[in-house]
Structure formats: structure tokens, C-alpha cells
Amino acid sequence: MRKHRIGIAFFYHESHSFSPMKTEIEQFRNEGYFIGDEIYDAYTGTKTEVGGFLDVLKHDEDVEIVPLLCAAAIPSGVVSTEAYSIIEKQMLESIQQAGRLDGLLLALHGAMVVEHLFDPEEHLLGKIRVLIGPNVPIATTLDMHANLSEKMIDYTPLHFGFKTYPHIDMYEQGTHAAIALLNQLKEGVTYYASFEKLPMMPPSINMRTAEGPMHKMIEWAKQAEEEAGIYNVSVFGGFPYSDIPVVGASVLVVSLDPQKGKETAQKMASLFWSVREEFIMDLPGVREGLALAMSIEDDKPVVLADISDNPLSCGSGDTTELLREMVKMNIPDTLFGGLYDPESIEACLNAGVGNKISLSLGGKVSPEFGEPVQVEATVVALSDGVFHNSGPFNQHLRVDLKGAAHIRVGKMDILLIGRPMSANDPEMFRHIGLEPATKRILGLKAKNHFRAAFEPIVGRIIYVDAPGVASNRLTTFTYHYIPKPIWPLDDIQYEVKRRGTEKWTH
């Protein structure tokens, strides 16, 4: 019996239209750029979408895995035309050179923006569909913050969104996508997609799935999946920092019964609209947040999350308002990190461990959100910045900070890192000898993903409203291309309208 040849690919970026940092090809090569068999070494045993693809396929003796191309970059500004073109060209060439493909598993983000493309994932799927033909099944995984468009569903109904934030079910959704693809390929299952796009782009700060409005939505989605004829329900919050016509929240129902799928999508969209106001949060400023942290008596550290400069929300990782106030207060047993500052790391390398040095910290990429902080520091430790995640988010994945330095300023410790990276795993600190669990206050460049690994070792978590490109106050951005009217920028009425249903036949 001829084996089913199934390709695996990954093209992942979350793009911020207002970030000062354009995303070039170097960012992809620094984060993760793997071709062919390199994909096995990079992702086997990881709790990622591609790890899920591999685990399902390698246990099916009727399948031949065809590793193609995986490219990912840390969230930042829009992807340059050159970078996108290089990766798209190489991916399409890898598909052409692979020969016969009977199916394709593709991990995407869903919130990529390119200089010349508002909807690059749809563009890529269209190019792939031309290459492999209309009858080869494709299944994708998508981030919960995807700005999903109806055009993407023209190419396949099989899109599986994450159901957790922090995203700790990437592996699970990878397995779901692979199983659905095999069902279609081997059993002839026909899937239907029912899609509802809502006129809203809620701030992502309150999209955590442990509690709040997105928790409600995911619970309703899981209940719907228990009903006959419903295969999968994805709830996408969208990415509100994308200034594009397809921005915003949506619901996608993959079903075996098109009428049931349509009814479920409409119901879920109505529920989503009904909880929209619950996504709005009022956050304390930096000084107010620090005062609150100082008032808390706890055996565990209090976290001050600098959410407006979270690198995984495309922040530069080097804004300074929270850092400046913490340095002024000089509180014992405090830790701040990771601050993106390769220049200061280089200065620490030149000075050497144990020596004192004058540094100008942060404020180099985004000085409009705070000038550099002038400090006298002691170099405590230096590192190449390489570690492996131990927490549930991207578990076991290798991380390369491109260098790191532990410095002490007064009574506080600061971790400097060589590229923007959210402080989502304690190993970022532990790999250089810092134990966050022993501190009184942690100032973290992070938003929600860090909770997966940090919640067991910390106490109170306080989000602070400091200046930054990832502010939860969407009125601070000047949009040009988003659809209007749209909530929360506009006060509008909305009712779910009946839509057509796309059908995919194999």
C-alpha cells in the first residue's frame, strides 16, 4: 500500500502595525529557521504545534512525513516585504521539490502583517493551494489572537485555534489538526466551516482563559463540541494592534453537519458580543502599582507586569518607566528583567564579572516611552543566554537570548538580555544564577503567558499601565485601515447575520 505523504510547515509571526521595529529575515533566523530534517531536531519532544503534528504522524504506519520549512520570529513590527518574500519563496520551493503531497499540516499565527500585505496567511494559503491542487487536504493551527479572514476558509475549513491563554495547548491543537487531516485523507470525512466575524477588537490583556470573558467563551465552545455534528469550535480574540481591514474577533465552527455548524457559529458569535464589556480593564500606573506591591505582605514574590512593553505583544523590551521607579525606590530583594540592552551587555563583558560599571540602561529602541536610566552597577554574572523552557508554555523549547548579564544596582538585581524576549519562564533567570522565587518583588517584561510557569512560585500579580507600544488603551493608536465602526473605539449595535457556509470536499 502506498503511504500517505504529509508535509509539515510552520510560518509564525504576530505583527504590530505601530511598533518601531520592522521584522527582517534576521529575526526569523535568530528565533527559529529550520529546513527539512532540521525540523525533527528542533521540534521532536516539544509541546508545540509541530511537536503535535510529529507525534500523531510518526505513529501512523501508513504515513510518510515530509518536513518542509519552519520559520518563526518573536512578535514585533510588520514583516518586511523582503523577509516575507524570502520565506514564502523557500516554502513554495520546498513544496514543489517534495514531489507528491497527499496532505499538508501548517502552523500559522493568524496575525501576521507584511509591508505590502494585510492578510499574508491567506496569501500564502492561496499560493500553496495553486501548487498542490484543489483536492489535497490542508489543516492549520492558529493563535487565539488570529485575525482570521473569510478568505482563509476558501482554501480549507480545517483551522484549529488555541483554547488557552497562556497558550499551553499548542501541542494539543497540533494533534487535533493532524487527526482531522488523517480522517479526511483516509476515511473520506467531509468537514464544513461556519464563520462569524464580529465588529470588535477587544484588548488582549483580559483574554486569559483561567477566568473572565474568554474563560466563558472557551467553556461554551467546549460544550458546543459535545453536540452531535460539531467537530471543533475556535474562538479568536483577534490582535488589536494590527491596523488592517480584517482585524478583530471571530468564531469558526468545524462541523460534520453544515446546518448545525451554522447555528452554532451564530450562537457563539452572539455570546461573544454579549461579554465584550468584560474585556475592558482599568490598570494602576507604575507608582500606584509599586505602592500596592509594597503594601502586600506575602511569603511569595509580588509581580509587577510591565504589560505595555511585553515583547510577545511586540514591545521593544527596553522601555524604562517601571525600571526607573524601581531603581529610585531601591527596594531590597527585587528583580527586574529581562531588559533588552545588547549595548550594556557588551559593556559588562568588557568590564568583567565582579567589576563596577556605569551604564545607560534601556530606552534605546523606544526612547519615546522613557529615556535610558543612568546607573552604577556591579557585574554579577554573564551568560550566552541559552536555556530550555521548563514551564508549560513552549515546554522544552530551546531559547537563545543572544547573551545575558546579571547586574546589581543598589539593592536590586537586573537581568539584561541580548534580544527582546518576554519573561515567560523562570529558566530565563535561573540559567544565570537568579532565583525569582526568593525575591520580594519581580518587575517582569511580560503580560499573560508568564503565568503558566510563574503562578506556582509567586503571589499577587499586578498589571501596571506604563507607556509602551502594547498598551491596553487602544485609543492611543492612530488607525488607518481597520473596519469602521468597530468596538471598543465606537459604540455600535450588532446582530449576527446569516452567512453562507464553505464546504471542502476531498
Language-model segments: which ranges?
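Cap/lid and interdomain-hinge subdomains that line or gate substrate/regulatory clefts
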Residues: 64-66, 75, 139, 146-149, ...
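Flexible inter-domain linker/hinge segments
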Residues: 186-191, 196, 200-228, 246, ...
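N-terminal amphipathic/basic leader segments beginning at the initiator methionine
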Residues: 1-59
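Extended hydrophobic packing segments that form well-structured cores
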Residues: 67, 273, 386-506
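Active-site histidine-anchored catalytic micro-motif
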Residues: 7, 11-14, 18-20, 28-29, ...
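Hard-cation-handling environments
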Residues: 6, 205-411, 415-419
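Glycine-rich phosphate/diphosphate-binding loops that line cofactor/substrate pockets in enzymes
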Residues: 1-3, 59-62, 67, 93-102, ...
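Low-complexity, highly charged intrinsically disordered N-terminal segments
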Residues: 54-75, 79-83, 87-94
